[in-house]
Amino acid sequence: MANITKKWLRFQLLMASFVIFFGAGLSWAHSKQETTVPANNAVLTEAPAELVLKFDKPMRITKLALTDRFGNDYEVQRTDQMKHVLKLVAQLDPVPKGEYKVDWRGLSEDVHPMKGTFSFTVK
């Protein structure tokens, strides 16, 4: 019985060590969105010429979409070539007055899937 208890304790110690050394490192490696241009919920007097997303760690954006409140899609011209970047800049053709939402999805360097959204209004 004592032999089983020792094995069980060793196993628990091994698992705890794994979580401490590997689990914590993985959670620290995830990227997060720091800022956007336009800022979330910004009200603009003219349409932006570009969208900018800044991250705290490199991120590979796999999807970037701009839609209006009716669900119409607008073209964004990316400059990142699907590489890991700290700052993504996407050029926009002029958009009419209205409410817009930007949706993005991506992968951090540790291949953790990430996503986010922000909105702005052109008056």
Regions found by a protein language model. Give the residues of each.
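N-terminal non-catalytic regions of secreted/periplasmic and cell-surface proteins
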Residues: 27-64
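Bacterial N-terminal signal peptides
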Residues: 12-24
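Extracytoplasmic/periplasmic copper-protein system
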Residues: 2, 25-33, 113-123
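Short hydrophobic/aromatic-rich motifs at helix boundaries and adjacent loops
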Residues: 6-7, 33-36, 73-78
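Acidic, low-complexity Ser/Thr/Gly/Pro-rich repeat segments typical of extracellular/periplasmic
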Residues: 52-121
